[in-house]
Amino acid sequence: MPIRHCIVHLIEKKPDGSPAVLHARDSELAESQALENLLVDLNDSYNAKQGKAWGLFQEESGAYPFSGWLGAYLEGARDFAAFSRQAVEHLKTLMEESNLSSGGHVLFAHYQQGMTEYLAIALLHHSEGVTVTETLEVAPAKHLDLAQLHLAARINLSEWRNNRQSKQYISFIKGKNGKKVSDYFRDFIGCREGVDAPGETRTLLKAFSDFVESEDLAEEEAREKTSALVDYASTQARLGAPIALEELSGLIDEERPRAFYEHIRNKDYGLSPEIPPDKRTLNQFRRFTGRAEGLSISFEAHLLGSRVEYDEEHDTLTIRQVPSQLKDQLKRRKDGQ
């Protein structure tokens, strides 16, 4: 991962309304293996976080100046250290206005993955641990705790600069359970949600279910295509990358690589060519299958509790909204009697 620029500042702040103290670094961090390892681990931790939101910058204003500063840096009007210093001073001000906020090390990293450039911003915290010294003594030691990554954002700079119509070039970690602790960080970036990742993922899965039903696939083939979808989407989520519908379509059916893509377009599900995956929604999309004595049943796990009800006590399975093709067969059989 080529690292263009990276710097770390420190904001000391307690969540009690007390003033924040900024310790700003004057120069960028030098390239090193330790720095590269840190960014790789940070990326992995960030990609693994559930509950991220995807969006875009607010209109630049006095309340949301960050995008203007970032644009000036990218155009060469100021260097990376000066840009980060201006940004972290703004973050410090917002921290002081939020009684819920606490300080930490603020990392800014401009790096490249493949052909895409990113800016990552994260508030890092330490955890207490222990180490064994060179003299074989046990001593306390601090380390960056990336498992406790709660405030971070990643901006796809290439997407922002080349596709101003995009509504998903920023991803950021949302607060859990309605907590407002992350609001000041979102205001610092100056971003708003542009894409509902869980909703988009649910729509994709609905489109896939409709596709499988319309194709009247055999049980084994339906299971294979479901696995192909879930495996690809889960991999994209792990990489922090979007689901590309045309690429997914080719993986689902190699002989007819555009069949699923054309199904989505013809039925007008309203999906963008690329959508952000939601891991929690994907985890619910597995198939239950069973076969015995001339009976074969297969359905997606997310339907359990809605269209499919299982009564363990009476050993019964109730199916609502019977598939249209099965319904037609049953009606023809009934009419023929």
UniProtKB/Swiss-Prot annotation:
GO molecular function: double-stranded DNA binding; single-stranded RNA binding
Pfam families documented for this protein: NA37 (PF04245)
Family annotation (InterPro entries): Nucleoid_associated_NdpA (IPR007358)
Family per similarity comment: Belongs to the YejK family.
Keyword Ion transport carried by entry: no
Source taxon at top rank: Bacteria
UniProt subcellular location: Cytoplasm, Nucleoid
Name listed for the protein in its UniProt record: Nucleoid-associated protein Avin_11450
Keywords from the named record: Cytoplasm
GO cellular component terms, A-Z: bacterial nucleoid; cytoplasm
NCBIfam families: PRK00378.1
UniProt-listed HAMAP family: NdpA
